[in-house]
C-alpha cells in the first residue's frame, strides 16, 4: 500500500493549480463540471491492455488511502465527487500513475534462455571510486542484484600460498575474498519478485588445484542451487528462465593467454578455448557464451554502413546460442563497449557494462531492463527469433513505419526538492527537456523542448512525434537540463523507458540521477499516444 499522506500534504501546500487549470481550459468547464468529465479523464489514463487496468486500479487504491485518512471522496467510477486536489494527487503520483507496468509477465518466461536479453554487469565488484575508499567491494554486487542485474562477473587470481582472491590482473589494490562475494550473491540473488536465474561469469588464471578449490566453494555455498548440465543428455536448446528459477549458473571466461582456435559456425567466427582445466571445475560450468571475434566483432561496431553476410549470420547465430559483448581492452575508461542498441538489434543476449562506462550507455541499459517488471530478462522480439519468408531479419533494410508515437510534455515538478542545492542559487532555473529515441538507425531521433526561464515548475505543453519502424527495439529517453549561457548545461534528471511498454494516456514519469538512483520528487507529466 502506497503511503500518500506525506505526499498529499506537500502537494496541497506547494503545488500550483496548473493541472486543474489545464483540464478547465481543455474542456471549457469549471470546478462544478469536473465530475462530469471523469469518464474522459479515465479514458486518458486507461490502456487498451487488459493486464494493466491502470486507471481503475489506481483510482481504487487512492480511494482506500483517502478513506483511511477520513477524506470524503467516493470511488472514481461512482462519479459523485471529484475534488481537484485529488485529481492533482492522482496525476502526479509516479506510483499510482506510472508510465510502464511494474509487473513481471511470468507467462512469457517459458522460452529457451537464449530467447532473452539478460541484464549483464562487467567487473561487478568495482566501486568506481579509485580516488577515495576501496576500489573493490561486495556493495556494488549487492546493488546490482537489487537493481535486477542477472549476470555478475568475477575475476579470480591466486592469492598467497593457496588462496583465491577477486580482483583484476596487474592491480595491487586490496583484493576481495571469493567466499565473501559468493555469500553476498547467495543472500541477495533472489527475492519473490526476482526469482529468475543468476549467472556468475568467472574469469580465472588458476591452476587445476585452485580450480578444484573454487568448485568446492561454489558447491558448499550454493548446493543444489547450482545448475549442472546433464552429460548424458544433449540439449538442443537451453532451459527456460521459468525452469531455472532460483538457480545459479556458472559461466567461465578463460584468460586471453590460453591458446585458442578459431571455428566457424553458421558463418560466425568463434573463439574456442583450449588449456588445462580441472574436470570438476568443468562440470560446474553449466553455461557457455561466445564473445565477438573477427567478422562477428566487425558486425557489432558502429561504423558499418551496409549489412554484410556476417551481420545476418550473427542474428541467425543468436537465435539459439549465447553472445556476450564487452570492452575490447582492459582499460574500461579509454575503450567503452559497443553501443547497447547495436548489439541488441543483432540479438546479442548479454551486453556487459560497468560503472566506468559512459553514463548515456548506462541509461540505455537501465531503460531496457525496466521492461518486464525489472526482473532482468526481456524477451526478444519475434523477428529476432524466427526467419521470415525473405530470410533472416536485418533491421536496417527496407524500413517501413509501423507505428507513430506522440509524446506531449505538459509540465514538471520536484526540482525545488531534489536539486535546490545545486541549481537556482542566484535565480530560478531555466529548464528544458531533451527527448530522444534509441533503436535501429532509422528510428533514432533527438528533440528539445523550449527553455522555460525562471521556473521551478515549468509548463511546456509541447508535443513531439516519433515515427518508428521497429518499436520493439526502441527506447525513449528524457533528460532535463538547466540552460546555461557560458558553461555546460546542468543535468537535472533523466529516465529511459522501453517504448513497447509505454501505457497510453497522461502519465507521471519519474526521473533518476546520473547513476540511475530515483529522485525523491522530480517527475514529468507526459502523455503518450500511438497512431
Swiss-Prot record:
Its cofactor is Ca(2+). Residues 265-385 form the PI-PLC Y-box domain. SMART domains: C2 (SM00239), PLCXc (SM00148), PLCYc (SM00149). The keyword Metal-binding does not apply. Pfam families: C2, PI-PLC-X, PI-PLC-Y. SUPFAM superfamilies: C2 domain (Calcium/lipid-binding domain, CaLB), PLC-like phosphodiesterases. The keyword Phosphoprotein applies. It is an enzyme of class 3 (hydrolase). Residues 107-253 form the PI-PLC X-box domain. Its main location: membrane. One of its GO terms (molecular function) is phosphatidylinositol-4,5-bisphosphate phospholipase C activity. This is Phosphoinositide phospholipase C 9. The modification Phosphoserine is found at residue 276. InterPro entries: C2_dom, C2_domain_sf, PI-PLC_fam, PLC-like_Pdiesterase_TIM-brl, PLipase_C_PInositol-sp_X_dom, PLipase_C_Pinositol-sp_Y. It comes from Arabidopsis thaliana (Mouse-ear cress). It is a peripheral membrane protein. Expressed in leaves, roots, flowers and siliques. It is found in: Cell membrane. Gene3D superfamilies: C2 domain, Phosphatidylinositol (PI) phosphodiesterase. Keywords: Cell membrane, Hydrolase, Lipid degradation, Lipid metabolism, Membrane, Phosphoprotein, Transducer. GO terms for cellular component: plasma membrane. It catalyses: a 1,2-diacyl-sn-glycero-3-phospho-(1D-myo-inositol-4,5-bisphosphate) + H2O = 1D-myo-inositol 1,4,5-trisphosphate + a 1,2-diacyl-sn-glycerol + H(+).
